[in-house]
A protein has these predicted regions:
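Conserved catalytic-core motifs of eukaryotic protein kinase domains, centered on the activation segment
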Residues: 24-30, 89-90
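Conserved acidic catalytic loop of the alpha/beta-hydrolase fold
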Residues: 35-52
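Conserved hydrolase catalytic core segment
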Residues: 50-87
């Protein structure tokens, strides 16, 4: 069943369970990073071919990185609000030893929640992927920001040429052309 918010999309819709989330594999003892999740999405991209990416929360950051890393294959990245959007902030903090909550059915691996909540997201790192996408993509607007929340990395992204603030429906209509 296709969610109503993406019903304007004319093509197939695929969903990805990142490592440690949903029905995907769970690595023993954690070891999660956004770049590991980007590798999951990159493997899907290699199998499916050129795609428009819609990422919610943590998935928005992954979509941005993949748009910069594979600008010829990503036919637009749409960044939306959702859990994990902010990450761990723009700089590292003192590590703490925290016992993750007990695993709940259908919830992400507790280590994923813990490690990805601390994932550092410097604005200049994020904007380097925007610039790469803009320079190498054939699209006039390879990044669309639909998120209302503006963590530091996303506030920097919206200031870059080639990134547009728009609604989800407008972004999907734009990339469907």
């Amino acid at each position: 069943m296709v969610p109503e918010r993406v019903a304007v999309w004319p093509g197939p819709i695929w969903a990805l369970d990142f490592t440690g989330h949903g029905a995907s594999s769970v690595p023993l003892g954690g070891g999660y990073s956004v770049e590991i999740l980007m590798a999951d999405a990159d493997a899907a991209l290699a199998q499916l071919g050129s795609l428009t990416l819609v990422g919610h929360g943590l998935g928005a950051y992954v979509a941005l990185l993949l748009a910069g890393a594979r600008p010829q294959q990503v036919r637009g990245a749409v960044l939306c609000d959702g859990p994990g959007l902010a990450g761990g902030g723009p700089r590292p903090v003192t590590p703490a030893v925290v016992r993750p909550v007990e695993k709940l059915e259908q919830a992400p691996d507790p280590f994923a929640l813990l490690e990805l909540a601390r994932d550092v997201r410097p604005p200049d790192y994020a904007t380097s992927f925007v610039r790469q996408a803009c320079q190498l993509s054939e699209l006039d607007r390879p990044i669309s920001v639909c998120a209302i929340e503006r963590p530091d990395w996303l506030a920097a992204v919206v200031e870059e040429p080639g990134a547009a603030v728009t609604t989800l429906a407008e972004a999907l209509s734009h990339y469907a052309r």
